[in-house]
């Protein structure tokens, strides 16, 4: 057997069987959705701590009643904190930057996977949705699915890539997010 490969056997065959190994696009899509969900949760926490507008809590429809109560207590307690504001800016910049992949400019941005902040309000001529200007990301799932079919290897490299051939990831969105967050979560 091959490590990391799952065989889905359908039944016995009297003829030779041809095996095709395909990337698990569904697992990749789920991992990307989970990453974006975690990013949005972090942005929500930063927004709650650094802003006083209670309406932002109402926009977070996934919060339980207890979480809403806690969020209201924490609302704005670190308003003006430069550390959190720098972190928010750093994370937003990281999500918007291009990263080197085998497909070049055809797959260099998270937006090309369907991951972006879409601040335009639906149907509003030139209007913006205030809630979407808080740094949250959205996923256009059809774009994500198509990118994972057409550019799977480059999409993988977009998140983590060895650009100098030393077999160590040194570039990519996940790599950059880790580097941006590391100073805030390390001990000491």
What is the meaning of each model-derived region?
Residues 68-71:
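Gly/Ser/Thr-rich loop/hinge elements
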Residues 49-63:
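Short, glycine/acidic-rich hinge or "gate" loops at secondary-structure transitions
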Residues 1-46, 73-188:
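Bacterial flagellar/type III secretion structural subunits and associated motility module proteins
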């Amino acid at each position: 057997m091959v490590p990391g490969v799952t065989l889905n056997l359908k039944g016995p065959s009297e003829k030779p069987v041809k095996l095709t190994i395909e990337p698990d696009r569904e697992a990749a899509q789920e991992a990307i959705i989970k990453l974006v969900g975690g990013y949005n949760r972090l942005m929500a926490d930063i927004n709650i701590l650094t802003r006083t507008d209670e309406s932002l809590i109402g926009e977070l429809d996934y919060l339980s009643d207890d979480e809403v109560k806690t969020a209201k207590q924490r609302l704005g307690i670190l308003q003006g904190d430069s550390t959190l504001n720098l972190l928010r800016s750093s994370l937003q910049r990281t999500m918007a930057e291009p990263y080197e992949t085998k497909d070049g400019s055809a797959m260099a941005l998270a937006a090309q996977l369907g991951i972006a902040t879409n601040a335009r309000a639906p149907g509003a001529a030139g209007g913006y949705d205030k809630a979407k200007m808080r740094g949250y990301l959205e996923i256009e799932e059809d774009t994500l699915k198509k990118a994972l079919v057409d550019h799977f290897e480059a999409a993988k490299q977009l998140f983590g890539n060895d650009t100098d051939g030393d077999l160590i990831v040194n570039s990519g969105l996940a790599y950059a997010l880790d580097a941006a967050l590391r100073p805030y979560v390390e001990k000491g």
